[in-house]
Design a protein with these regions (language model features):
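A generic structural signal for short beta-strands and their flanking turns/coil linkers
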Residues: 9-11, 21, 32-34, 66, ...
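Acidic, metal-coordinating catalytic segment for phosphate/diphosphate chemistry
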Residues: 1-13
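Charged phosphate-binding loop/patch that engages nucleotide di/tri-phosphates or the phosphate backbone
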Residues: 129-145
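A structural microfeature
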Residues: 24, 69-72
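Unchanged
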Residues: 43-67, 74-128, 132
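Conserved Nudix-box catalytic region and its N-terminal flanking loop in Nudix hydrolases
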Residues: 17-59
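Conserved positions in beta-strands of structured domains
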Residues: 14-16, 71-72
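Conserved hydrophobic "DFG−1" position in protein kinase catalytic cores
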Residues: 15-16, 24, 94, 113
Length: 145
């Protein structure tokens, strides 16, 4: 029997409000504890990527998102328990009217609402998230031309 070392599936979401602000979370746990992150996490068995990110958003922010749209994916290596876990990180977007019902919980120590001009990829501690934020900002800039 041959075993293929395939990546684990993980999700993250760019959640914006009607003012165009981005909802980020401050990581409560290592790796990259204390840095900014996007709501998201590993998918559970028997759930779609969309179900997984909607669940993670609810767990980390308390926000009930009804729909997400797929943006892009990035390969990643996630340090966990002394291991290097290869992941396929799937990035989504969601829009909400406001963040008034949001509350930090689960892996999120704090919620951080960022105005578009205050979003800096380097503030996001995990490499794939850092890359994704840069890519997302470039897309936004191109859309506004």
């Amino acid at each position: 029997m041959i075993y293929y070392a395939n990546p684990s599936a993980a999700t993250a979401c760019f959640i914006t409000d009607s003012a165009g602000r981005l909802l980020a979370v401050r990581r409560a746990k290592d790796p990259a504890k204390g840095t900014l992150d996007l709501p998201g996490g590993f998918m559970d068995m028997d759930e779609t990527a969309e179900e997984g990110i909607i669940r993670e958003i609810r767990e980390e922010t308390g926000i009930e998102v009804e729909a997400v749209s797929y943006l892009f994916s990035l390969p990643n290596i996630y340090p966990y328990g002394g291991m290097r876990v290869h992941t396929a990180d799937l990035f989504f977007a969601a829009q909400v009217s406001d963040f008034s019902s949001a509350i930090a919980s689960d892996d999120a120590a704090e919620l951080v609402i960022l105005a578009p001009d205050d979003i800096t990829p380097e503030d996001f501690g995990l490499e794939s998230i850092h890359q994704a934020v840069g890519r997302w900002l470039a897309r936004k800039k191109n859309q506004n031309r």
